[in-house]
Structure formats: C-alpha cells, structure tokens
C-alpha cells in the first residue's frame, strides 16, 4: 500500500506504482489570490489539462467538464475578477490566435463555428472528486455543468437541452 512507504522511498514508490499499472495525482500549486492574479494578466489564457474520457469509460478529471463553467460562474459572475468579454476572449480567440488556429476562436465568415450557448445566471460547474482520498480522479457518473443549453462544433449542433444529438462533426 502507498501508506507503507517511508518519505525516503519516494523514488521506489513512483517506480512501484508505475510497474503496477501507473497512477495519477492532483497537485495544488496555487492559492486563490494567485489564480485571480494570473487570470487578470493581459498575457494569460484560460485552458485545462483535465483528461477526457467517453461517458462510461473510466473516470475523467473534474477539470475536463468544469474548468470553463468555473471561470465564468465563479470568477466572472460571482467575484468579478474578469469581465465576461475578457474571460471569453481568454478561452477562445486569444489561444486560437496564439497557437495559429486561424479558423477557430472567432465568429466570422469562413471560420469554423464552434459555439457554446450558455446562461451566465445558471452556469455552474458540478464536476467533483467523489472520493478524493481513495481515488482522486473519480468523477463517475460524469457530471456536466448546469447552464449550458447548446454546443455547436463546426456549425453543427451537438448538445441541446435533452443531451447529445449524436452528431460527431469534429475531427483531429
């Protein structure tokens, strides 16, 4: 068991866990004032390193479903750390331009239409770690955010109030 290792055995612990199928971990490196300062930087973009899984396959990290609703709900609506316009720009056009994705991030003729229709007043992230001391990445069942009514990928509606439409217009 993990708790049986002494602090001096950290390298052995990591090697042993990898040999037994690997592991995942959550590290908290920033406190709230740091997060808010970073968000307000004119050079800061908003993104997530949360891993995604298909519903029913494994347990995704809560950030996979909660990052953007958290920013809009907590830091825009509740705490006024960013304006709605700044937050949306930091999530869409700014990263798209920075990474050279010229057909993404803006609504304009000739660009791909990736659109999220949300109600800021109802927007709430619901993703959690259900058992943080046992299996830190457990997020089963998938807990999608509240307040997102429609999602369009490449101009095709994929999410509506009733759920996924079955359309898969995205590509890699």
Report the location of each language-model feature.
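His/Asp/Glu-enriched, well-ordered alpha-helical/loop segment
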Residues: 1-20, 33-124
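The substrate-binding groove and active-site-proximal loops of carbohydrate-active enzymes
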Residues: 25
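C-terminal cap of metal-dependent C-N hydrolases
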Residues: 37-43, 48-51, 117-169
């Amino acid at each position: 068991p993990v708790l049986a290792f002494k602090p001096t055995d950290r390298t052995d612990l990591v090697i042993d866990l990898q040999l037994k199928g690997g592991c995942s971990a959550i590290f908290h490196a920033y406190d709230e004032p740091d997060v808010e300062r970073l968000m307000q930087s004119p050079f800061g973009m908003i993104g997530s390193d949360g891993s995604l899984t298909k519903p029913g396959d494994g347990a995704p990290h809560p950030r996979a479903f909660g990052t953007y609703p958290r920013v809009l709900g907590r830091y825009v609506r509740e705490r006024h750390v960013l304006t709605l316009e700044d937050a949306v720009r930091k999530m869409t056009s700014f990263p798209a331009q920075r990474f050279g994705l010229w057909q993404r991030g803006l609504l304009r003729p000739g660009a791909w239409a990736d659109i999220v229709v949300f109600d800021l007043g109802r927007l709430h992230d619901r993703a959690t770690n259900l058992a943080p001391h046992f299996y830190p990445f457990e997020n089963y069942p998938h807990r999608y955010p509240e307040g997102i009514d429609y999602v369009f990928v490449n101009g095709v509606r994929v999410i509506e109030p009733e759920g996924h439409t079955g359309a898969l217009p995205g590509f890699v």
